């Protein structure tokens, strides 16, 4: 299945050349129809397996936070699990597919809007390039208190210095 979603040329295996760039070999190649079929099968199955291994029941799960590849895939997973779509975190309509960041972004949003609370039984489920997939069950905890806030001005200053040093 790795040929269905991959980057044909990359890294030291096939470094960039004029020919590989001209042929678009450093961009993601995807057979959308087959990836959709795969994703709709594994999202539900992986969630069920994780819930079973945690010795939970499906009705105990407060929210499922899936990879946000495509809303239709999430809807198909909901149908496969026989759950209302409201049990799923969905933000792909706001941000599109944010790749590996989609689950953490959705989790933060669910906390911010009160849908994900302390002690909620939660499933995180995703799939990706090479048609890998996985799911994990978590009992949500409160965030650790921060000692101090991040000093954005300092990091922007460091970024300007780094940018300057890369140009000289």
Where are these regions (language model features)?
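Condensing-enzyme catalytic core mediating Claisen C-C bond formation in acyl metabolism
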Residues: 1-37, 41, 45, 139-168
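Glycine-rich phosphate-binding loops at beta-strand->alpha-helix junctions
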Residues: 61-80, 95-97
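Active-site-proximal alpha-helical scaffold in enzymes
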Residues: 100-116
């Amino acid at each position: 299945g790795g040929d269905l979603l991959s980057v044909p040329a990359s890294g030291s295996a096939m470094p960039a050349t004029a020919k590989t760039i001209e042929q678009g070999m450093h961009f993601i190649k995807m057979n959308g129809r087959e990836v959709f079929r795969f994703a709709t099968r594994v999202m539900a199955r992986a969630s069920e397996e994780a819930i079973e291994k945690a010795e939970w029941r499906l009705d105990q799960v407060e929210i499922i936070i899936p990879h946000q590849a495509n809303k239709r895939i999430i809807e198909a997973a909901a149908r496969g699990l026989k759950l209302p779509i409201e049990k799923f975190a969905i933000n792909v309509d706001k941000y599109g597919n944010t790749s590996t960041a989609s689950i953490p972004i959705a989790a933060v949003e669910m906390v911010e809007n009160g849908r994900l609370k302390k002690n909620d039984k939660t499933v995180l489920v995703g799939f990706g390039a090479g048609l890998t997939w996985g799911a994990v069950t978590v009992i949500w905890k409160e965030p650790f208190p921060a000692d101090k806030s991040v000093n954005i001005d300092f990091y922007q200053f460091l970024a300007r210095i780094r940018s300057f040093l890369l140009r000289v």
